[in-house]
Amino acid sequence: MTGRQFGSARAAVVLAFGLMLALSACDRPMESRTPWVPHLERMDEALARNDLPTAQRAAHDAFVATLITATWEGKIAVGQAYQRLAQHPEWRAEALKTARREYLDAFFLARQQGSLDGLLASAAGFASLGDRAVVDQCLFFARIMAVRVGGDAPQRVAAWTERLAGTGASARMTESF
């Protein structure tokens, strides 16, 4: 086998392996597609027992799980979890900082994945933090995506804009970041 043939064979094997991984993801049970969920359940159970160190460890484990899956859904879920941790004064500042970072990651993943739902969920996350400027930016990009998607997407964005304006988040969307 020549070097060129070997290179072609190796490329074919790599391509086949990649295709196999992609197809197997569709057949995986929901738990393996949402590996952060058990950690968040453990966090909530620990919070209910007022076991703050275990809750923090579980939240961190969920955070790590979202690094592996790289989905906006996981980032939103972990951001919300860190907001629950922020209800405890000793972790408030760090937890809110982490929640904000998770919502920002969710925003960029949603844009990359072409997910209008992800952009809207990111906007809601920032609204819950009171970050009006970033809510505006999320909704700005949601409007752009809604025009591309068509259908009822523009109406959905308008409804979210109105809903988030009711939370104190601004609805001005004139410039991007």
Language-model segments: what does each one mean?
Residues 2-13:
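Bacterial N-terminal signal peptides that target proteins for export
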Residues 148-177:
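Terminal, low-structured helical/coil segments at or just beyond the last alpha-helical repeat
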Residues 12-22:
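Bacterial N-terminal signal peptides
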Residues 46, 59-66, 106, 110, ...:
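Eukaryotic all-alpha helical interaction scaffolds
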Residues 26-58:
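N-terminal leader/linker segments that initiate helical-solenoid repeat arrays
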Residues 59-61, 93-106, 135-144:
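Alpha-helical repeat scaffolds
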Residues 33-44, 71-88, 116-128, 159-163:
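Amphipathic alpha-helical repeat scaffolds of TPR domains
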Residues 44-54, 85-97, 128-136, 172-173:
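Short coil/turn connectors between adjacent alpha-helices in alpha-solenoid helical repeat scaffolds
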